[in-house]
Amino acid sequence: MKTRIALFALIIFSVISCKKHKTVEEKTLTSLEQLTTGNERFLNGRSAHPHQNKKTVLANQDGQKPFAVVITCSDSRVSPEIVFDQGIGDLFVIRNAGNLISDIDMGSIEYAVEHLDTKLIVVLGHTECGAIKAYINDKDGSYKKHFNHIDNIVETISQEKEEIDADKKTPKATNYLGAINANIEHSVKLIQDNPIVKEHQVKIVAMRYDVHTGKVVEL
């Protein structure tokens, strides 16, 4: 009986120690390190699922203080809070097909930077992106395959300078990963040129998520 009690006490102590260690770790890691270490936990099946409880909801009810902005694709396989193992109030997420930057998206970025004082912006593209596949398959450049708003996505990507340059070096039909990276690079450059982002000296990072492995790499 005493052995069982001692074992139970040891388990409780270990859990409390781990929670305390994680709290200290969060405070010492940079914003980018919080994302990369979170992805490592996700990859290794050790997701901590932080800040996902009623206590966190109450702590954020009067405002938010996200440590990073993440611009990513609408693809259901690419959920930033999951792949980076973050929780409520941690990330300011902007999503659309192809992780593009429209005026509205830029306005959202400006809000996070100017009003929430967020100091890290991540553009997170991903493998097997349907928007990039549609662009690659648009061989004749007509864009009008669906005769609806989907065509606008393809046209926007096809006009990106980085995509045009990449296609000149290696035809897009044989350079799928290059097309994904060029699209990410284009969004990064648009953000870098934003006056508010410049003024607040925000760090901007290009990343790519692999839907086959769950791994995020920095470009």
Where do the PLM segments sit?
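Divalent-metal-activated hydrolytic enzyme cores
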Residues: 19-65, 88-89, 98-107, 111-116, ...
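Short helix-loop-beta junction
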Residues: 85-93
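Short glycine-enriched loops at secondary-structure junctions
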Residues: 72-77, 97-100, 126-127
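Conserved functional hotspot residues or short segments at active or partner-binding sites
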Residues: 123
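Positively charged n-region of N-terminal signal peptides that target proteins for export
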Residues: 1-5
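Portal/gating segments that form or line small-molecule/metal binding sites
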Residues: 81
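C-terminal motif of bacterial Sec signal peptides marking the signal peptidase cleavage site
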Residues: 14-17
